[in-house]
Amino acid sequence: MASDSSFPGASSNVAEYSVSEISGALKRTVEDTFGHVRVRGEISGYRGPHSSGHAYFALKDDRARLEAVIWRGSMSRLRFRPEEGMEVIATGKLTTYPGSSKYQIVIEQMEPAGAGALMALLEERKQRLAAEGLFDPALKQLLPFMPRVIGVVTSPTGAVIRDIIHRISDRYPLRVIVWPVRVQGDTCGPEVATAVNGFNTLPDDGPIPRPDVLIVARGGGSLEDLWGFNDEIVVRAVAASHIPVISAVGHETDWTLIDLAADMRAPTPTGAAEMAVPVKADLQASLASQSARLSSAMSRFFDQKRQAHRAAARAMPSADQLLALPRRRFDEAASRLTRALFVNTQKKRVHFDGHARQLSPRLLQRRLVELERGVTMLGQRLPRALEAFLRERRTAFTHRANRLSPEPILRRTRLTGSTLEQLDRRRDQAVRLLIERVKRRSQELDRLMRTLSYESVLERGFAVVFDAQGKPVKQAAAVSPGDALSIRFRDGDVGVVARAGLTIPDPTKGQ
């Protein structure tokens, strides 16, 4: 059996290590040799901090890959937020992980690998978000002219918030609500986005008033310092805000993606305050100027209208001139109406007098007597006429009875008897109706006669003058002085003698 010395190297002086020993030796060698290194590479596999606060990813270049870890304490001290694909310079120490024969870098500090790398990443993000329409000018909102509440997203300490509040107080004092955030570091972007979204979710009638305009502000700094305002979640929050947003990040020469998404960009935080509120003194001066101009314009307007009114009044005829022709027509119509009424009254009086002369009492009495006589004669003649008619019919019936059978004769006799009875009843009814009509007519004529007779005039308080022959005196010219006259009143006659020169006043003229 061959001895162990037959194997190659069995008698060499190479030290023998266990797996743990060699792993520990490697760990000490790596940590001692590379205790503090700076590594440049591209971040790969970055998913943000773990729930523990640590971050695990890798640094790579074209030919190699190095695992990396940032503990929670170091993560909170970073001045920017790491992102996938960002080229960085990491400072830390190398260590191995014996359990899996892997080595990694424990990063203590990390910074972007120059402005060029950040600008390239920034340009790529800008193009991608612009393609989504987040920077579309059509989405921009107008700033309110007179906001009631202004919301400010910035650090609660520092000169920025003091400058904003001081500038607003100088221009137009109003309520300012500050949402405190970190304006640098890994948590800057999420906190700013949370603040913008939080202001938008405030109800209009809640205990905290909803701002009318937002100011997102930060002082100047390097690209790395301002990198949190290039965060995609910040850009999306500002673009989706229903409240107008003014971006005031950095100095006038600085720019971030939030400037493109905001509704207005201010060169400085102080400039943002000036954009948000007007100057109260300027408003008062403008209001006074506008008021003076309005008063002057109204004064000129009323002066012009007053002059135009006076000119129109001078050109128009006076009221007397306007009413002269209608007044003349009215007077002529009134005169014609008076004459027409007088003439019509005279015609009616003449017509009435003519009918009154025809309706003398004796004539009416004679007419009534004639009507009564006619009715009496008709009443006397009607029975005799009926008896004669019946005799004639009876003779004819008797003559025909000799030639006809009894039955038809009996039927016709009964029918004729019924007809005669009806005629007899109708005769009596006709006589009664005729007598009633004559009576009504006589009564009407009697009432008319009484109305037209001079006795009715006497009943109303008038008197009738008769001459010596007993004729009515119709005109004063028919009476001579010394004539004997008789005045008939309602209750009797009085004899008088006419005298000359006596004038009795007209009672109607004294009314």
Swiss-Prot record:
InterPro entries: Exonuc_VII_L, Exonuc_VII_lsu_C, OB-fold_nuc-bd_dom. GO terms for biological process: DNA catabolic process. Keywords: Cytoplasm, Exonuclease, Hydrolase, Nuclease. CDD domains: ExoVII_LU_OBF (cd04489). It is found in: Cytoplasm. GO terms for cellular component: cytoplasm; exodeoxyribonuclease VII complex. One of its GO terms (molecular function) is exodeoxyribonuclease VII activity. It is an enzyme of class 3 (hydrolase). Bidirectionally degrades single-stranded DNA into large acid-insoluble oligonucleotides, which are then degraded further into small acid-soluble oligonucleotides. Heterooligomer composed of large and small subunits. Belongs to the XseA family. This is Exodeoxyribonuclease 7 large subunit. It comes from Brucella melitensis biotype 2 (strain ATCC 23457). The lineage of its organism: Bacteria, Pseudomonadati, Pseudomonadota, Alphaproteobacteria, Hyphomicrobiales. The gene is xseA.
